[in-house]
Amino acid sequence: MGLAENGKSGQSKYERMDSDFVEGENLHLPEKTNNKGTRKYVLACAIFASLNSVLLGYDVGVMSGAIIFIKEDLNITEVQEEVLVGILSIISLLGSLAGGKTSDAIGRKWTMAFAAIIFQTGAGIMTLAPSFTILMVGRLLAGIGIGFGVMIAPVYIAEISPSIERGALTSFPEIFINFGILLGYVSNYAFSRLPVHVNWRVMLGVGILPSVFLIFALIIIPESPRWLVMQNRIVEAKSVLLKTIESEREVEERLAEIQLAAGHSNSENHEERAVWQELLSPSPGVKRMLITGCGIQCFQQITGIDATVYYSPTIFRDAGIKSNSELLGATIGVGCTKTLFILVAIFLIDRVGRKPLLYLSTIGMTTCLFGLGLTLSFMGNSPFGVKLAIFWVCGNVAFFSVGLGPINWVLTSEIFPLRLRAQASALGAVGSRVSSGVIAMTFLSVSRAITVGGTFFVFAVISSLAVVFVYKCVPETKGKSLEQIEMLFQSDGQWRGRQGDEVELGDTENLVQKE
């Protein structure tokens, strides 16, 4: 797998990635900067694009409490409860799979709008559902909308962000997921005292509001410059880059780099193989990208974070809390912790790097999950056991939020080359959603078989395997452009856990083979 050739006759099939820049560098144009408002503009775009992520977070948070009242109002069974909770993650894979093709066809921006409209429809149906069957129909639609949203937001943000700030900005969707979870917990507590046939409907209906704001926000934000280059709309792409990058010289260099990566100078080179064929029959470099991207997405979920968040009332009830109001109050503490530590990650991700934070996250989660298993197994139904269980749950979500939570979205959106980015990110999102759905749809059944404490021992073992995966399969990508990261995966040595290998801007002179 490699970048496209320049397409000049008589040239070798090996090309310097920076060969298209040389003439521009010799012009010695005076450099202009337009830093006034640039950072604020990029920040605003990242925030608006992340509003779809609030939908997923809100659903996770609100369903943990709403399900208590849905069970009472609609008289659903435990199996129906598991299906209702977990089906959204499973069905969202349809949106994630379709999201790659859709975003390449209509653009990143309008794919986000499409996602918001589908979710609004589903949320409206859930709010008015008179039966379990109608509730499931609404949940299926909401899941498809969320699948589109969680796939496209990180891609869009990565493609408009300057390299130096991309890590922090691309983690915004995870921040907004956490914010949505907290809003869901607060909504549960705030409306829990309404009549049982009304409270859960209000809880679910409030989730429509973020998607309404997103539709208005799309009037403001621009299309992705990389998508515009793929559509041969170079002038528009440059206009967007001028708004998001401070240096005019860097704008010219970045535009040339994007054109080269997109195969704009010789577009027929990338028509030789369909994108999905390349993903399903990958070269060694693409295979490494898929292992890293899809692997980190799956580990994010199979370490049990959604079980902790969706079923936190069940966990706290097993620890000894009895009343619904106390259960929902304890979940607010979990939501606050999760949101606080995701903000910590934003400040560290481009300073410390991706890999050190992943080590901290996975090792910390392993410790907390093991501690929670011990507490629920041997100290349940005691005042000290309740406090300790809350401590371990909050610790687990804190370590998750400081590393594995945001960084998996950052890595998935930045490691794939432009021509594969949308579809590969969709595959990563599919892995995440399927894993999440399986965990959510089996947690109660597994807990009944091996106890809640035993289930968290299993999660602790899986989390320890995530530490090994980070060491073996995740390279450091801090400070590299999206196009430079592609080169990083061409080197087997650099991919296999060597943090000291840095790809500088000048390293684009490395030779890349065209397949």
Model features per residue range: what roles?
Residues 2-246, 253-256, 262-515:
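Alpha-helical transmembrane bundle of multi-pass membrane proteins
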